[in-house]
Amino acid sequence: MRLTASAIAGQFGLTVLGDGSTEVSGVATLAHAGAGQLSFLSNPRYRPQLADSQAAVVVLRADDAEAAKGTALVAKDPYTAFAKIAALFDVAQVCEPGIHPSAFIDPTAQVSPGAHVGPFVSIGARSRVGDGCVIGTGSLIGADCVVDDGSELLARVTLVTRVRLGKRVRIHPGAVIGADGFGLAMDAGHWIKVPQLGGVVIGDDCEIGANTCIDRGALEDTVLEEDVRVDNLVQIAHNCRIGAHSAIAGCSGIAGSAKIGRYCLLGGHVGVVGHLEICDKVVITGKSVVRNSINEPGEYSSGTPLTDNRTWRKNAARFKQLDVLARRILAVGKEKE
């Protein structure tokens, strides 16, 4: 596919600087773009690459336009504009409607004639798959699940039981949704299992990364509101609620019954303690541990910054002495009084 710079600008409301007839057939980074490829400049860190870039077209802010040596598309947010343009060149494999002969469909399940069910898929009792859905190879949909219109399960996705997906949900390979929550009670020195009788509800336009696990609730449902984005290898425990338009980066873990507000961002490897609440529009930086509820929007961090090992070891040793040192300082202050 080839598009002119003018056609792209018209579709996304951008301003053309230079030759609007320049053709684009693909996208690439500034450093590696070549003839016929479009790139973007969003982070000032990469501004030095602009002068040497061989990109046919560059999406950038007005402030950077003078440095562009070829055709440019001016956008308020170059990264968002680039994401929309790149989608034009992301040609997905077309899956024709139909059920593969190797798939198993329970007699009580309902599968839309417009859905695609791939090889070795299993769909359990009373489950429903909507129009335009794609169920990838080897996926398992257990009993009493709903996959609403336009949703896609890539290869080997598991919906255990009582999982309800909204419209246009996308789940990547290996994800497990609706497994038992980690509910245990101690009885006479032995653990007994607390039945997990709830389900999982995932709203419209959510995306779940590869090998992520979202457990079903004990009594009520675990809920992801609409347009939540979850990266790979994330654990969301039972009875959590994730607010709309929030995003959670890889290797994060959210303990049971935690509530995260709308438009929140969690960096990689963030830990959230159970039974607390995070308000709307909170950013938690990577490797942080959230031990208390957060009631004010803003950016929060925890942990020790990276330093050379020798300095870190000295500081770690001093950390153990903080209480003793603090008591000495207080004692000196009282003596001076």
Curated annotation (Swiss-Prot):
Annotated catalytic residues: 238
Top-level enzyme category: transferase
Gene Ontology cellular-component terms listed: membrane
Catalysed conversion reaction: a UDP-3-O-[(3R)-3-hydroxyacyl]-alpha-D-glucosamine + a (3R)-hydroxyacyl-[ACP] = a UDP-2-N,3-O-bis[(3R)-3-hydroxyacyl]-alpha-D-glucosamine + holo-[ACP] + H(+)
GO terms, biological process: lipid A biosynthetic process
Top-level taxon: Bacteria
InterPro entries given in the database record: Hexapep (IPR001451), LpxD (IPR007691), Trimer_LpxA-like_sf (IPR011004), UDP_GlcNAc_AcTrfase_non-rep (IPR020573)
An example molecular function term from Gene Ontology annotations: N-acyltransferase activity
Enzyme Commission number(s): 2.3.1.191
Keywords tagged on the record: Acyltransferase, Lipid A biosynthesis, Lipid biosynthesis, Lipid metabolism, Repeat, Transferase
Pfam families per record: Hexapep, LpxD
Pathway(s) where this gene product acts: Bacterial outer membrane biogenesis; LPS lipid A biosynthesis
Signal peptide location: none
Subunit structure: Homotrimer.
Function statement: Catalyzes the N-acylation of UDP-3-O-acylglucosamine using 3-hydroxyacyl-ACP as the acyl donor. Is involved in the biosynthesis of lipid A, a phosphorylated glycolipid that anchors the lipopolysaccharide to the outer membrane of the cell.
Family: Belongs to the transferase hexapeptide repeat family. LpxD subfamily.
Protein name: UDP-3-O-acylglucosamine N-acyltransferase
Gene name linked to the record: lpxD
